[in-house]
């Protein structure tokens, strides 16, 4: 399975949802960097299951155990390796899934690709549980970025079509960026959050689920970070964001909305702010030609409704080659959007930190 991100950083995610452990290795972090384990644990707690009425009742401590790369709280130059032990699993809920694939899940495609040898319990390696090690890597990168004056934050932009307020794409301040992450439900507008919770509760009562949108921003980036074409900042961030299993779309700046604008509306006019070049608007999301322009980097990720729902659904028996019905057992989130917010932050942090390391390496070359 291809679960490796390769750049100046090499990030490799391993494990399955109901395996003894899940984990990550991160190679390429310079020696001597401080990692605050309490801050990392708090970041992981935002993703952890069992918090909020919208979350699965499966509870996991999600406490990372570092096996390599960290000595007395500082990186030592060896690959950073950490595992999280899986302690609350009920694999019996998944026994029939090799024969009857769940709609909306990777059961069928995994069966075809891996010939029946894949681990189906809890979704195996395809599970959203694997975003926990992604958050270990991203949580470390967030800390390293913050020490450079670069901050990553996100909030729920919408759930079930109910919109939150948006980040200010031009004048976003650090306090406003980070404030949603301090809340149990990471929104800007608390009244919108209450309506979202109502929509989640309604879907849950109907044995259904809802999806939504997450908006993420990065502040403090210098102009000139990234590359054209295949290694642009959009490419890097999108690749890692799509590692989150529920993400089905990513857009930057005005995104698909630019298709309805004229050039005179979409262009972001430049102006001088002292010695600094800025733009009056930010439809580009802080990226032009794959390269940052110094404005806030803003993007959004579309998160699908949880595919595991309690309603009886149509499926097939692969062994009998006939249509059948499926009723999914187990513990599932009626909405995974709130728990996905730190995952999107993690993806952005890895991409940005990796790009910074690459830029620094280039500047060191004669």
Regions found by a protein language model. Give the residues of each.
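Generic N-terminal targeting/processing segments that precede catalytic cores or assembly contacts
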Residues: 1-366
């Amino acid at each position: 399975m291809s679960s490796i991100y390769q750049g100046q950083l090499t990030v490799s995610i391993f494990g399955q949802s109901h395996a003894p452990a899940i984990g990550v290795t991160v190679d390429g972090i310079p020696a001597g960097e401080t990692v605050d384990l309490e801050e990392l644990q708090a970041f992981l707690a935002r993703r952890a299951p069992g918090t909020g009425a919208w979350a699965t009742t499966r509870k996991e401590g999600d406490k990372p155990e570092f096996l390599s790369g960290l000595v007395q709280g500082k990186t030592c130059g060896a690959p950073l390796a950490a595992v999280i032990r899986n302690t609350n699993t009920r694999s019996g809920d998944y026994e029939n899934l090799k024969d009857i694939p769940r709609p909306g899940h990777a059961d069928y495609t995994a069966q075809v690709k891996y010939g029946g040898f894949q681990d189906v319990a809890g979704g195996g390696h395809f599970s959203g549980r694997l975003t926990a090690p992604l958050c270990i890597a991203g949580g470390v990168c967030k800390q390293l970025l913050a020490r450079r004056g670069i901050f990553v934050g996100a909030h729920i932009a919408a759930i079930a079509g109910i919109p939150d307020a948006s980040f200010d794409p031009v004048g976003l301040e650090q306090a406003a960026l980070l404030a949603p992450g301090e809340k149990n439900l990471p929104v800007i507008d608390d009244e919108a959050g209450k309506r979202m919770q109502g929509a989640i509760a309604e879907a849950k009562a109907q044995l259904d689920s809802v999806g939504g949108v997450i908006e993420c921003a990065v502040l403090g980036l210098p102009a000139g970070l990234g590359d054209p074409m295949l290694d642009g900042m959009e490419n890097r961030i999108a690749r890692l964001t799509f590692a989150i299993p529920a993400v089905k779309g990513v857009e930057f700046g005005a995104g698909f909305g630019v298709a309805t604008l004229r050039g005179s509306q979409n262009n972001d006019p430049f102006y001088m702010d002292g010695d600094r070049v800025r733009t009056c608007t930010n439809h580009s999301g802080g990226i032009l030609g794959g390269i940052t322009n110094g404005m806030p980097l803003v993007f959004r990720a579309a998160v699908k409704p949880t595919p595991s729902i309690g309603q009886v659904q149509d499926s097939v028996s692969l062994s009998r080659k006939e249509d059948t019905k499926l009723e999914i057992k187990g513990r599932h989130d009626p909405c995974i959007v709130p728990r996905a917010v730190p995952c999107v932050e993690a993806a952005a942090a890895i991409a940005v930190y990796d790009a910074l390391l690459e830029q620094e390496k280039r500047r060191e070359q004669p």
